[in-house]
Amino acid sequence: MNNQNNGNPVRNSGVSRRSLLQSGATTAAIALAGGLSFPAAAQVSASTSADKISGRRKLGQLEVSSLGLGVQNMSRTYQTTIPSRPEMHRIIRTAYEHGLTFFDAAEAYGPHEVERILGEAIAPFRNQVVITSKFGWDIDLETGERRPGLVSQPKRIKQAVEGMLKRLKTDHIDLLYQHRVDPTVPIEDVAGAIKDLKAEGKVLHWGLSEMGLKTLRRAHAELPVTAVQNEYSMLWRGPEAEVIPLCEELGIGFVPWSPLGVGFLTGAIDAKTRFAQGDIRGIETRFSQENLPNNLALVELVKSWAVRKQATPARIALAWLMAQKPWIVPIPGTTQMAHMLDNIGAAEVNFTPGEIAELNKALTSIHVQGVRLPPNVLAFSGVEAAEKS
């Protein structure tokens, strides 16, 4: 991979760099925050080839492959380059050929263009896969212009879905998420719009992302929620405290975004790393000069397990997530074929109960320092919807 980003090198001590998480403006960073994910780097001598993904998982009543593929960066990388469209189609189709049937998109990705790329790629086998999209950010329905704030009025949700269906070249969306909770709109009203769309056959299941706990309960009481999509990885274990237990209580599946810790868990970041201008990780305190040396202990732990299990660090990080609950389905994203194949190989990494207990204990002993997102992005997480009057 090319380490250059618009002439500004991002150096990493001899380690092949993973895709940069770029965002040219604050609004773009916020809008994209629901799907920050990186491709896997082959950093040990494990093969990047993969057989078909073994096993299926249930998100509520929705059956999917044990891993998914996030397609967020397939229209425009964070280095601002435009990936080869035919190559993106090839990656998606190869993933399907290897048994991956769960593809994650959103209207905010692109905006709009990622949905078009996914729709083009899956057209030959649309009814054999599960596709997701998301609404909620203030995206112009026609131009895709990204504006500040959120919008989840029922009429707007329905209009957004019509656009999604056209771009995805389909007559239904298997799983539709509210990308972030709009604090001005009762979640009961949002659920009502989804009910109408389900009655029309345009949406089959629904979910929420980064919502408040009370909102999740209210939403599920109004219309059963299939899945929650939140950030979750070895680097950010916050959902373990309340969100995952609530999902277990309610029978809701869990889909971790950024399952590789914005690339950190692959070994792509070390003490010598210098982020390019605009890379959101450059303003994340987890990777500041003060906190990074402490947090690198986590990477060393993952690398040690990679050697022990004869896998790549990416596979260890993903397999660890899948070992936490049988209804957790990570969605690592990539624009590189080899990285996609490496990622799906995580399905073949198994931990014994003793191993997972040992690894969890070691992880707990490492206290990650710093906040997971910049404050202006984090402000959209854990939000409660307005009460229904």
Where are the model-predicted features located?
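Short, acidic/polar
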Residues: 82-95, 153-166, 216
